[in-house]
Amino acid sequence: MRLAEIFGANVRRVRLKRGMTLESLATEAGLAYSYMGGIERGQKNPSLDVAERIAKALECDPVNLLRMTSADK
């Protein structure tokens, strides 16, 4: 699995665990809804700045979004 796919899957898992919609996460992170969807599908490669904004919106450590498991610690 590519790193972009791992990151996207972890973002989706944490977002759903937090009860957030894709739209609310995109808004909170200051990103376009379509771009956020592309990230979750592993089709977009976000910059480190964007990854940090997503992690902040999800209230999680950005490093954990890159791991194969335990993304929501």
What is the predicted role of each segment?
Residues M1, K56, N64-K73:
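Short, charged recognition helix plus adjacent turn
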Residues A9-E28:
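Short basic helix-loop element that most often maps to the first helix and adjoining turn
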Residues G30-N45:
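Recognition helix of helix-turn-helix/homeodomain-like DNA-binding domains
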Residues A51, D61-L66:
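C-terminal structural segments of small proteins and small subunits
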Residues V11, L25-A26, M36-I39, L65:
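Conserved hydrophobic/aromatic packing and binding residues within compact polymer-binding modules
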Residues V11, L22, Y33, L48-A51:
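Helix-turn-helix DNA-binding elements, focusing on the entry/boundary residues of the two helices
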Residues Q43-R53, D72:
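Short, basic-rich loop-to-helix N-cap that marks the start of a DNA-contacting helix
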